[in-house]
Amino acid sequence: MRGVRRRRLQRGQETLQAVLVVAFMLLPVLFGIVELGGLIHVWIGQQSAAAIGARVAGERGEDDAIVRDRVAVELHAAGLDPAHVQVTVSPPYVRWGQPITVRVISRRHLAIPFLFSRDLTLASSYVGRGEVNH
C-alpha cells in the first residue's frame, strides 16, 4: 500500500516538474521567436522603404518632398509609423552616376520574459545612382 502511494506522489512531482520546465524554459523561447519575428518584419519594411527611397532619389537627383513621401508610403505599407522613423538622404543633390544614399533608422524595444529587456536600433541603407544631370 505504501509503495503504491509513494509512486503516485512521485508521478505528481514529475508532472509538476514538467509543467515548471515548460513554463520557465520553453515559454521564453516561444516569446523570443515571436519578438524576433517582429523585429525581422520591421527590418524588412525598413529595407524596402530605403530601397524605394534610393531609387526615387536617384531618379530625381535630389532629396525632396517626393522622396520623403515615397519612403513614408512604403513604411506605412509595411505597418510602420513614419513619424517614429528617421530618414536621411545624403548627399542632398547628385549628378549623373553619382551615389545617393538613403538611410532609415528606428528604435525598438525587445523584451523576452525571464531573460532580458533591451532597446535596439535597426538601421537600413541603400545606395542609388543619380539618373539626371543638374
Write out the residue ranges for each language-model feature:
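Short, conserved structural patches
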Residues: 55-134
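Alpha-helical assembly-interface signal, strongest on the long, hydrophobic N-terminal helix that forms
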Residues: 2-71
